[in-house]
Amino acid sequence: MLAKTKHQATIVVKPTFRAVATASVMVLHGAANAAEIKVLSSRGAEQAYRELVPRFENETGHKVTTIFTGALDVQKRIAAGETYDLIIMGGSGIDDFIKAGKVVRGSRVDLAKSGVGVGVRAGAPKPDISSTEALKKALLSAKSIGYSTGNSGVYIASLFERLGIAAELAPKLRQTPTGVFVGSIVATGEAEIGIQQVGELTHFDGVDFLGPLPAAVQQITVFSSGVQVGANEVEAAMHG
């Protein structure tokens, strides 16, 4: 059974984290005793992930230590040689790591799906974003627009081009540094409207979530996990 948050097109979580984390325990030499599982995760599925991890820890006695950061920083950390048991990010990123020999082939597990959503500062007027035309009007009327360097930011930049409004919006775009929530600049008023993965906006203090992008222009990102090559002699552990 799939569990959903209260917002449609937001995050759909498969209850498979136990299986993924159990696989990482295999990586830790099949230890029978409580193990520490090191996870590097992008922020897109953070809320859903945080809901699953305590249950897993209580059921198994294993400890999960997680670093949450932006997708670009995940790539930089792995490129710099940092080692973890599991990596969680957009599925395409995991696939790229597999091709590069950084993640064990066959270890990818899809964990969650997330759409892109829109938010404004708490208490601010709430523009209509229920249709593509309404969204365009809201964006063109906004004094400033926040978006991220992650998957949603790449998509949003291409969407502005597709809608034919990129040039008009360019002077008022505010892109957050990697690992920084768009909600943080919406909450302070630096950005009048913020656009990011739904799970990164719905639980941010100081932000009123307007809803997901209209279906016609929505993009769903699949967040996946993969076992990092070289983590605790992973090949021997998985095949031994």
Question: What are these language model-derived features?
Answer:
Residues 34-72, 76-80, 91-101, 105, ...:
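Exported/periplasmic ABC-transporter solute-binding proteins
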Residues 3-20:
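Bacterial N-terminal signal peptides that target proteins for export
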Residues 84:
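Dinucleotide-binding Rossmann-like beta1-alpha1 core, especially the glycine-rich loop
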